Amino acid sequence: MAKTLKTLYQCTECGGTSPKWQGKCPHCGEWNTLQESLAAPEPKNSRFQSWAADTSTVQSLSAVTAAEVPRNPTGMSELDRVLGGGLVDGAVILLGGDPGIGKSTLLLQTIAKMAQSRKVLYVSGEESAQQVALRAQRLELPTEGVNLLAEIRMEAIQTALKQHQPEVVVIDSIQTMYSDQITSAPGSVSQVRECAAQLTRMAKQMGIAMILVGHVTKDGAIAGPRVLEHMVDTVLYFEGDQHSNYRMIRAIKNRFGAANELGVFAMTENGLKGVSNPSAIFLASYRDDTPGSCVLVTQEGSRPLLVEIQALVDDAHGFTPKRLTVGLEQNRLAMLLAVLNRHGGIACFDQDVFLNAVGGVKIGEPAADLAVIPAMLSSFRNRPLPEKMVAFGEIGLSGEVRPVARGQERLKEAEKLGFKRAIVPKANMPRNVKEFPNLKIYGVSSLQEAIDICRDSRE
């Protein structure tokens, strides 16, 4: 007698299941996300196997030989920087980004470059083979050695991987794949989780460097279950304004390199090109004689970046002053205004305050505090800051200036780009000032000291 399939209700947000329908998911608390699905019977030979090729045994950690993991350069220098030097055999990378941002273009360029020395396979679930060929032709990419498979059925993809034994595989995208073992539609939580698990298992067993393309939700998170990001080795986000020519790729998680590393690309007629000096791009339109502008030296992974911080402080025309930020934390702005009022004696309670990090950069580190304050003061007084000045440092609630990481590297980058002055935390002052002959460094320990320096007239 055939076994009756059991009906379950699965959450489209977190993937949790419930035996009966409920308005609110009992796992993540979201409303109206439970959908009816059928639980497929588990076969005798379970698909849940170890990702290791052989059966693992208990052994002493001291007996395990730790070898240096070899890196395979992708041919894209900025992508290699984010990955930690290149692709690792058996690594699974998840690349997410908004529609039209250039994910497929970047990976097609990468595959074409790696095909010169590695056996590659591009699996397209969103475009036909003809569409991929047209895109490669438009980008003027060499297609010799690039193997292409237009398929979304997981079992067919697994067969192709076993037959062709590729070394590098791109799956575009994981949300279009489906497995016959799951009854739900492609793109559902269960399908995404199962397909990602099967691909990850094959990548580990066969030593394939695999890149999965992921869609994002309207909130900017990668679509599908959260376990997808835990399952892979590296999570990359492709960011940028579609109205701008510049794109940024950021590592959120990386088991084989540093997280929070940043790579910058420029979109051209022939695809994406790496930008070796992004600070020059972010400061292309910078003028130091403009009130409300200050240059911040921020740190993205191992790379110092110079970003212009713009502030506009104006009289409020309503009962509630506006506080808006682009690229900076809005809660941080509210805190800095309170500190400026209490410890700097400058009240902005009746002023609208707008902040912008030029170039579409998103800055999350507190080192931006010491650049935001001078920018706001400059706009408030309608007086430019001393010329060729940069700043970085964290400001505490009691008005103290706290040190930040990698102060020496930030100062070297500022001097290299021709800046003459720097306001930094006293603890970040270099031991030997002679190492920076062209940079006058002001070490401050309090907010008031920084304000006094900003009051100096332009030379």
Predicted features, each with a name:
Residues 98, 125:
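P-loop (Walker A) phosphate-binding loop of NTP-binding proteins
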Residues 3-13, 17-81, 88-94, 101-111, ...:
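Peripheral, non-AAA+ core regions of ATP-driven protein-machinery
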Residues 129:
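Divalent metal-dependent catalytic cores for phosphoryl transfer on phosphate-bearing substrates
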Residues 120-124:
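Conserved RecA-like ASCE P-loop NTPase motor core of nucleic-acid helicases/translocases
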